[in-house]
Amino acid sequence: MLIIDGKKTAQDIRAELATEVTAATAEGRRAPGLAVILVGEDPASQVYVRNKEKACTEVGITSFAYRLPAETGQQELLDLIAECNARPDVDGILLQLPLPRGLDAQACLLAIDPAKDVDGFHPENVGRLSLGLPGFVSCTPAGVMELLRRYNLPTRGKKAVVVGRSDIVGKPLALLLTRSGEFGDATVTICHSRTPDLAEECRKADFLFLAVGRPRLITGDMVRQGAVVIDVGINRSDDGLCGDADYESVSKKAAAITPVPGGVGPMTIAMLLVNTVQSWRQRTA
């Protein structure tokens, strides 16, 4: 059984990006820049932002941190986004979600320049994904696809089941899996809370993608022998972090599986860095 190591893969990606950025700055080009906007003092968001800033430093990306109080008004936040849109040294803008109550997250995401939307949340980038056009892809599904490529797990002609239909993971992942190519061309089923027989659908999957946020929802008896299981879920339980899969029983059936932690999670930040460097390449070419 193959354990798909997202932590090691993310380290490899950061090293590759660092080599590129170091070479470019040695030639006199400016470093990539990422604006990180955090509103309020949500503890989890603060941890996420620190991790992203640390990863930026490791790669050579300049991180512009904006930490705003929870009382920040909508217009003040929109003005800051407009300022970041206009800054030539900012290649990507990351608005840490969730926002405090009273702020319209959708309006703020709409205000971000799609060319700097390295989170891939802007409707223009979502539309580009659905049409198969170039654009920024949401970091978690992009990380999943990168793991499939780097571990040479092609989905062409396979049956893929995505459990979860969120706008951030489930839906974009399903779109990526249906794109033409060796790591696409899958026949995709999306399951959710209203799916009549989830176990039956999961057992049909050659590739099973879990992104529902329910600890150990999927057990070994729900998985086909030899399936590839990609567990996007990160849940807190009495005995620590766990995924949407019951790892102990599912790993006995799977041909390959991502652990939690150490699977998809590290890839999300890695792909944020990839998107930022991609924007920088385009803007400094």
Swiss-Prot record:
GO MF term set: methenyltetrahydrofolate cyclohydrolase activity; methylenetetrahydrofolate dehydrogenase (NADP+) activity
Residues in coiled coil: none
Pfam families: THF_DHG_CYH, THF_DHG_CYH_C
PROSITE patterns to which the protein is assigned, alphabetical: THF_DHG_CYH_2
Gene Ontology process terms (BP): L-histidine biosynthetic process; methionine biosynthetic process; purine nucleotide biosynthetic process; tetrahydrofolate interconversion
Keyword Magnesium recorded: no
The enzyme's E.C. designation: 1.5.1.5, 3.5.4.9
Catalysed reactions listed for this entry: (6R)-5,10-methylene-5,6,7,8-tetrahydrofolate + NADP(+) = (6R)-5,10-methenyltetrahydrofolate + NADPH; (6R)-5,10-methenyltetrahydrofolate + H2O = (6R)-10-formyltetrahydrofolate + H(+)
Pathway the protein acts in: One-carbon metabolism; tetrahydrofolate interconversion
Keywords on record: Amino-acid biosynthesis, Histidine biosynthesis, Hydrolase, Methionine biosynthesis, Multifunctional enzyme, NADP, One-carbon metabolism, Oxidoreductase, Purine biosynthesis
Protein residues bound to NADP(+): 164-166, 193, 234
NCBIfam families xrefs: PRK10792.1 (NF008058), PRK14184.1 (NF010781), PRK14186.1 (NF010783)
Record-stated family: Belongs to the tetrahydrofolate dehydrogenase/cyclohydrolase family.
Function: Catalyzes the oxidation of 5,10-methylenetetrahydrofolate to 5,10-methenyltetrahydrofolate and then the hydrolysis of 5,10-methenyltetrahydrofolate to 10-formyltetrahydrofolate.
Quaternary structure (record): Homodimer.
Name of this protein: Bifunctional protein FolD
Originating species: Desulfovibrio desulfuricans (strain ATCC 27774 / DSM 6949 / MB)
